[in-house]
């Protein structure tokens, strides 16, 4: 009973706030191609994805975040600035009551998750639902620019500086592998034998690295296959994505080793060229997609082209951690702090 009353009170408060908060707004296009009306200036944001939080941090607008998911809260080492923010539950199944109580201007969600219930529950409260995946390397620049456009001119300038930095490193990586023989590759998501296809961040990464991805004909972002399917295609390299994220080096190493062993021990996989040549690689999903995909691109290129002088993924990650693009932002901003 108390829970129902609490939800009702939050609903009334949010609807009252929405009624009186009518003012300027901007219209942006989300990842579904929809026109979304956003009240401006945006002061309060709930993000249902960790990649959304990372993008907002790049823009230096962490001050706008008022709620995050339980998953993001568990990653305190990666997101210390937001660890104390309220949890709104799981990214795919958020707590609408908590969101209503937080009264955000905008909730940032994936393209298709959660489902339409998100709009049905929140839009009547005056909460805009902005669906931006912010994961796929090919779409990330446009999506980040959309997000920056609602967070203000400084966020937009920092976003442009960030992509200048990404472009410089991408050019160096691609120059380093130019002319190298292209290996064949298959990439697997978290679920065993769930193969990454066109449109997925992991597939995009292999394409950016210039590999010949043997799943280019499946026509969908991911497909469940069996071992026979992989054995028939017989890739020279096999990439397995894993979710680490705890930032405990010893634990991450243990889990990476376990993951590699589980792949190598699959029935008949000793027949694969990738296994014979010790070319099975485990890639942390945090650097395989989202705003840090550049690090994953460098790591993947180094694996696929061992004879090339590929820029160090570690160095790129260090620059990312130190916001190395900020001098470009200040330069573009006329040197102002």
Kindly give the residue locations of the regions a language model identified.
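His/Asp/Glu-enriched short active-site or ligand-binding loop at hydrolase and phosphoryl-transfer sites
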Residues: 196-222, 242, 281
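Short helices/loops that flank or line small-molecule/ion binding pockets
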Residues: 95-103, 125, 225-234
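Positively charged n-region of N-terminal signal peptides that target proteins for export
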Residues: 1-6
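Short helix-initiation/N-cap motifs at beta->coil->alpha
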Residues: 31-33, 86-97, 113, 218-227
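Extracytoplasmic substrate-binding proteins
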Residues: 25, 35, 106, 116-194, ...
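A short, structured surface patch at a secondary-structure boundary
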Residues: 44-102, 106-112
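Bacterial N-terminal signal peptides
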Residues: 7-16
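Boundary at the C-terminal end of the N-terminal hydrophobic targeting segment
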Residues: 19-23
């Amino acid at each position: 009973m108390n829970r129902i009353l609490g939800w009702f009170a939050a609903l009334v408060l949010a609807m009252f706030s929405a009624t009186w908060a009518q003012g300027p707004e901007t219209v942006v296009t989300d990842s579904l191609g929809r026109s979304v009306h956003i009240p401006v200036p945006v002061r309060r944001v709930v993000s249902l994805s960790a990649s959304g939080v990372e993008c907002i941090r790049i823009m230096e607008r962490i001050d706008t975040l008022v709620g995050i998911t339980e998953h993001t809260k568990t990653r305190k080492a990666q997101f210390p600035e937001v660890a104390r923010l309220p949890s709104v539950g799981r990214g795919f199944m958020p707590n609408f009551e908590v969101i209503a109580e937080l009264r955000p201007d905008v909730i940032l969600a994936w393209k298709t998750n959660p489902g339409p219930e998100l709009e049905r529950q929140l839009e009547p409260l005056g909460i805009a639902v902005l669906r931006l995946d912010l994961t796929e390397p090919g779409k990330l620049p446009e999506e980040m620019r959309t997000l920056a456009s609602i967070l203000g001119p400084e966020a937009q300038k920092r976003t442009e500086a960030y992509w200048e930095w990404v472009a410089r490193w991408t050019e160096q990586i691609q120059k380093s592998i130019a002319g190298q023989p292209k290996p064949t590759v298959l990439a697997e998501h978290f679920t065993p034998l769930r193969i990454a296809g066109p449109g997925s961040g992991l597939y995009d990464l292999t394409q950016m690295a210039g590999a010949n991805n043997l799943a280019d004909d499946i026509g969908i972002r991911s497909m469940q296959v069996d071992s026979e399917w992989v054995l028939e295609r017989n890739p020279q390299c096999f990439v397995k994505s894993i979710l680490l994220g705890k930032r405990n080096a010893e634990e991450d190493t243990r889990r990476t080793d376990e993951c590699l062993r589980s792949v190598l021990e699959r029935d008949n996989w000793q027949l694969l060229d990738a296994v014979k040549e010790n070319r099975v690689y485990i890639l942390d999903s945090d650097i395989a997609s989202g705003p840090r995909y550049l690090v994953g691109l460098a790591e993947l290129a180094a694996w696929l082209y061992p004879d090339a002088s590929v820029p160090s993924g570690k160095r790129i990650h260090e620059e990312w951690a130190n916001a190395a693009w900020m001098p470009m932002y200040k330069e573009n901003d006329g040197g102002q702090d």
